[in-house]
Amino acid sequence: MVRPRRAPHRSGAGGPLGGRGRPPRPLVVRAVRSRSWPAGPRGPQPPRIRARSAPPMEGARVFGALGPIGPSSPGLTLGGLAVNEHRLSNKLLAWSGVLEWQEKRRPFSDSAAKLKRTLPCQAYVNQGENLETDQWPQKLIMQLIPQQLLTTLGPLFRNSQLAQFHFTNRDCDSLKGLCRIMGNGFAGCMLFPHISPCEVRVLMLLYSSKKKIFMGLIPYDQSGFVNAIRQVITTRKQAVGPGGVHSGPVQIVNNKFLAWSGVMEWQEPRPEPNSRSKRWLPSHVYVNQGEILRTDQWPRRLFMQLIPQQLLTTLVPLFRNSRLVQFHFTKDMETLKSLCRIMDNGFAGCVHFSYKASCEVRVLMLLYSSEKKIFIGLIPHDQSNFVNGIRRVIANQQQVLQRSLEQEQQQRGMGG
């Protein structure tokens, strides 16, 4: 239930505008207009995002992946984000309109199709704060983004205004669907249209499944945040690739976050002497939630060389300081089974990055666990020494490698 828009302020220093001994001054809230463009030209306007009675985001913080944003205080967790509990009873209505977003259809349905959802919604602010919304559009378009993608935007969250969003409970299915998606670690990004004359260009929406509330964060550095969020969205689209590996939210497998998608290519020995066949598989790299693996400069195709694991014993010290990622391969099951069989027989994959690639990673090692049925990638932090070490190993043990490959060929020939 929404309380009246205004409530009497207590006089004295505790009032919203301060000033001991002054009579209480009523807080004027602009009426919500039915149009998003002003009727006529107006003079110079003050900043439309400002807090009168408190510094930005006082009593609120964003922690975890996004880092601290304000004074530490008890809050509610929003999948790595936290803000203080807010109740509508002490808030003032600042905006009313409609929120629209697209929701991925249920599994086993057309993956390319999405459901368009809309809900009437209202934005509320604390008493004593002012949020100019008279030029906001009456419909806001929201894009759902995994919160892990926002880890690099922590500094831009440190200076934001909070607003609480409330949705009219007319469409229970849409509201439940939105709560379910955002409760599973997604944030809403509302990009305001350029034709809108308001100064707000972007607003982030978060949801707490524990407190059942939606909180909006409006960064004061709108220009910097818009550029940053566009880069995040572009990087995500590049990772997904043409046509998309998935529709809607980024894939999460076993609580891991998709960091890269592309193609892995390698050559495996054939039963015929001195012959090999080229193989490739669509592949994806996952990292733990909250971790960042910069893959925007990774090539779309990685080339892997199969090496007997016994050749790598001298490189064990360099493996001790490596980052672990998980590889996942899709589509061609026969090719995948063949790769699993080879690597289960004592081979490791050495993935060399092209020198044309501008990323810092030059080599990573791929290992396979037949017990857990997973591929683990090791990215040594000391890339330079590892590259030199793997080259020496290959150069000095070429004969051993050749014998191992021939033995594998014989085993495959006997098995066929």
Curated annotation (Swiss-Prot):
UniProt modification remark: Ubiquitinated by the CRL2(KLHDC2) complex, which recognizes the diglycine (Gly-Gly) at the C-terminus, leading to its degradation. Ubiquitinated by the CRL2(APPBP2) complex, which recognizes the Arg-Xaa-Xaa-Gly sequence at the C-terminus, leading to its degradation.
Chain intervals for the UniProt region annotation (Disordered): 1-53
Biased composition, class Gly residues, residue ranges: 12-21
Compositional bias per record (Low complexity), positions renumbered to this chain: 27-36
Coiled-coil regions, chain positions: none
InterPro entries linked to this entry: Med25_PTOV, Med25_PTOV_sf
Chain intervals for the UniProt region annotation (Interaction with FLOT1): 184-416
Subcellular localization, as worded in the UniProt entry: Cytoplasm; Nucleus; Cell membrane; Cytoplasm, Perinuclear region
Keyword Ubl conjugation carried by entry: yes
GO cellular component term of the entry, any: nucleoplasm
Modification type Phosphoserine: residues: S53
Pfam families for the chain: Med25
Keyword Ubl conjugation appears in the UniProt entry: yes
One GO process term, biological-process aspect: positive regulation of transcription by RNA polymerase II
Primary site of residence: cytoplasm
Keywords: Activator, Cell membrane, Cytoplasm, Membrane, Nucleus, Phosphoprotein, Transcription, Transcription regulation, Ubl conjugation
Family: Belongs to the Mediator complex subunit 25 family. PTOV1 subfamily.
Subunit and partners: May interact with CREBBP. Interacts with FLOT1.
Free-text function comment from the UniProt entry: May activate transcription. Required for nuclear translocation of FLOT1. Promotes cell proliferation.
Name of the molecule in the record: Prostate tumor-overexpressed gene 1 protein homolog
Organism of derivation: Rattus norvegicus
